[in-house]
Amino acid sequence: MVHEMDKTRLTTIAVVSMCDIHDPYIKIPDVVSYNHYFGWYGGDVSMNGPWFDKFHAEFPDIPIGVSEYGCEALNWHTSNPVQGDYTEEYQAYYHEEMIKQLFTRPYIWATHVWNMFDFGADARAEGGEDGQNHKGLVTFDRKYKKDSFYAYKAWLSEEAFVHICGKRYTDRAEEITRVTVYSNQPEVELFVNGKSIGKQKSPEHFFYFSVPNTGESVLTAVAGECRDESRIRKVDKFDEKYRLKEKGAVLNWFDITEKEGFYSLNDKMSDIMKSQKGKTLILGLLSGAGGPMGSKDSFINQENMASMMEMMGGFTLIRLLKLMGAANMSMTKEEMLDLNAKLNEIKKTE
């Protein structure tokens, strides 16, 4: 119909991850884009590039792009970012990886970050601040550019700059802390209290320094004529003000009992399912989510099983349970702890 009305107009479609690449409607528009959240809602961030390689290898004549990708970040911080923690550090890591995977594949016709700014979303209750989607590279009030904003600036802007990440993460407990710097200049030198700790070159525009963390330190990054400054301070233990504590959460990840060498709710789905006992436990759990396993009402059915299992592999089980809760398939705290106790009896598979 579109081509009948205007032969010069190209058509496109945005496709969600669960849609099989062999679905017939993929071939209807002139160009195609997928909404992929590998690394946030499912899977691992490393899955993105290979997925597009697979699509392009099978359909080299179909222009493929990314219509949505992103992850959420608020003013939470950590030195050990993980998927689903809502920290500025994980968002920065996620976008570093997405930039390296997407911007180096010339066959991808377009990429669309979701989103430039945090925005209102009345029904959402994530990350500790209700009513907003926090996938923006800039805060809702437009006053603070998150570190991930500067990752894109390093790749896309011709304006010379250097940026030290983690400015809102001052108090750190580790003896050696990692300091990340973004710049579109070829070389960055980092100074700690006026003393150089080294120079680095990076064609990827991301620079990582290991910094001794003692007392109070002034960090200065120099790239050509550009300078940026930040501060860190050594503390005895992790400051809980940096950690998200979900309001009304049935169970938080740090409340879960872990046994060395055994599984827990904090392990990834893909790791748990390496064990036959773990796989049986997980499939039994999912079989009761929404309807009988394989039925159209089930969380996983015959139509989406392969794609859903691929997506969920990067989830910790506690994160999956929270997403199921958001879809009105919640478990009580007692049920979660009982499930964790069962996992604590299953040895990890090498």
Q: What are the residue ranges of the model-derived segments?
A:
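Compact, charge-rich alpha-helical regulatory domains located at protein termini
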Residues: 253-336, 340-347
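Edge beta-strands of extracellular beta-sandwich domains
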Residues: 225-253
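C2 and C2-like phospholipid-binding beta-sandwich domains
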Residues: 205-207
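Extended substrate-binding grooves/exosites of carbohydrate-active enzymes
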Residues: 1-201, 210-212, 217-218, 222-226
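Alpha-helix initiation/capping motif
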Residues: 44, 145-147, 235-239, 332-335
